[in-house]
């Protein structure tokens, strides 16, 4: 958790933010899929050209505490995994502070009902941050980062700070923070999961968020999306290094290849990986030298989800995150993925070259000055899991030794003591 001087100054500006607040800092920007947000409205930033490191900071505008029972949200007006938020849950003081950031509707009993508006909250937050940053720049203090860029991307505020010779991108997201667990995801807890026995249920269900994003047909001014970013930080502790390496490699490929039109995001890939962890035997996923096989499996899973227009939210499986896609978009991306599947090593090498080029730009800038240490975020994998040449070589070996053949991961849950994968109709 991190409380930044900037958000502290925003709190002092008009006393809207909670005084005792917790901010979740995640390694990787919103474009990296660390939070389930829509990427359509985001400006394109390139690592190396625009920034060297990226983070996502979740800033609670409101907090609701656990009442020792599942949290029930008002989902009558929303698609699955989304909700409106009425300020009737809060005291009069909170309503008075925030009613300017609400839409208004008449309640059934004749009273005025204020619904917390994600777009209005984002507008207020951007204006407040702009005022605070302007004040900071007027009176610069020793050791304070240099503000290089501030932009509003939909409901997200993106700030690039210069710290020493490093440029850090922060995607700041205003959220509503809840302690406890939503009633709509209660049935998920009843299922068996890969993390059972590795971490406690209390660690997984310690809290969730509403983030400012609406469903495909939802009302932008009213609808929030459920986010389980806090839980995902805990679940990542249970994922093997080789699978995380495959995930990072696959993510690097799809960010470049499937960027237009927006259909598949890194968050979709993350959800597929979590489902794979539930589906496959732990002893298989623990294999240290199986990153290449895992990458092929993730590509296959991605292709399957696209063709079937089906990617269930990991925590709320009844919510299909791809149901809104058109057939045209599905087929376009499916063809692109087929090209990756036919020569995954080449596409991975291209992604690696992009990473290396970005790193060269970063090093070039860092030689001009010394770097300054930064706070450690809740890591999304970090550099050790970046795609590397060894994985590309392993993929190349699998493809070269079996020209023109379909290679897929196959799991026999009754026997995971040796490699299992399929080449055409033969299993090995």
Swiss-Prot record:
Keyword Nucleotidyltransferase assigned: yes
EC top class named in words: transferase
Modified residues (Phosphoserine): 373, 376, 379
Similarity comment: family membership: Belongs to the mab-21 family.
Keywords, alphabetical: Nucleotidyltransferase, Phosphoprotein, Transferase
Record's compositionally biased regions (Polar residues): 368-379
The protein's name in its UniProt record: Nucleotidyltransferase MB21D2
GO molecular function, one term: nucleotidyltransferase activity
Disordered: region residues: 366-389
Domain of life assignment: Eukaryota
Function: Probable nucleotidyltransferase that catalyzes the formation of cyclic dinucleotide second messenger in response to some unknown stimulus.
Residue numbers of Phosphothreonine PTMs: 372
Annotated EC: 2.7.7.-
